[in-house]
Amino acid sequence: MKNYIVTHTFKSKEAKAKMIEVTGSKSMEDMTKAMTSDNAKCQMSWNTPGDNLTMYCWWKGTNPDAINKQLESMNDFYEPHKFVECTDDVIDFNAK
């Protein structure tokens, strides 16, 4: 699978608050299941503070369509997702 950094932009402050409420009520196991399929899997997510309506996720997927399919149930919260494909060449500045 390919690596993608995906930018998710909430439709409103209310949509962001609702998403935080929904995810806060789920177990990590349930969230992982919801973000995993044979063709797409969320690796990590970064939320932004305050009124910033953007969040970022690192996905592994066969293509953006597979990731969009995995995210279908959350489309009420977000504007269309933006994808940047990344290589497997990672520079880990924390590695020793």
Predicted features, each with a name:
Residues M1-T54, T62-A66, D88-K96:
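Short S/T/G/P-rich N-terminal loop/turn motif that feeds into the first structured element of a domain
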Residues A17, N68, E79-K82:
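A short, polar/proline- and glycine-enriched secondary-structure boundary/capping micro-motif
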Residues S27-M28, N75-E79:
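N-terminus-centered regions that define maturation/targeting leaders and the start
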Residues G61, M74:
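A short beta-strand motif that forms part of the nucleic acid-binding face
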Residues L71:
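Short, flexible helix/strand-to-coil boundary loops that buttress conserved ligand/catalytic motifs
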Residues F77-V90:
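Conserved short beta-strand edge segments in small beta-sheet-based binding/regulatory domains
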